Amino acid sequence: LLDIISTGEFSVPTYNFTLGRPEGELRRYKLGPQDMVIVEGIHGLNPQFTRELPEGSCVKLYVSVKQQIKSANGEVISPMDLRLVRRIVRDIQFRDTSPERTLAMWPQVVKGEDRYIRPYRLTADYTVNSIHIYEPCVMRRVAIPLLRAIAEDSPYYKKARDLESRLMRFEPIDESLVPENSMLREFLGPVKK
């Protein structure tokens, strides 16, 4: 990060999520006078990566689903379950990872967050609640068929049924209605023409 600030230049690899490793040639970037770099990831708020940076050289954001969706009878879907649904939808499309594999990895994801993100979230300059109240209506159209494909003998069958039943409480909305510049596109992918 110090090199980026001092030289305005940096290189990044392309990460192949299917293979689980970087591949190909590094892409080189040179910043213009008005450009900025967004560093995203599990260690983005960790002070070990920012304590040596000049004061005022970075702005820290913590972006996460911060609220549940409730009905008159109580919680319909928790922030954690909504994040899991997002991940299932994203992983199948962009990481070639099955819903069952995503469910298997989820406890480790949460453990990593507890260790590497949550302790530092209060160091953020800004917190963004990334929930879209209509999100379950959109996600259900993609997620429910994926969840239904999980076999009854799977250790993740019960969780899949629970997520399905929660999503079924929402009216479906076609994902083509989600704007192209919406943060939900990170999970849904681009608008299909």
Language-model-detected regions and their locations in the chain:
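A generic hydrophobic-helix recognition signal that picks specific residues
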Residues: P33-Q34, R118
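Conserved NTP phosphate-binding and transfer environment spanning the P-loop NTPase/kinase superfamily
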Residues: P47-K193
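Structural recognition of the conserved hydrophobic beta-strand(s) that form the central parallel beta-sheet
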Residues: M36-E40, L61-Y62
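Short loop/turn elements that form and flank the Walker-type P-loop nucleotide-binding site
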Residues: L31-P33, E55-G56
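Conserved nucleotide-sensing/catalytic segment adjacent to the nucleotide-binding pocket
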Residues: L1-E23, M36
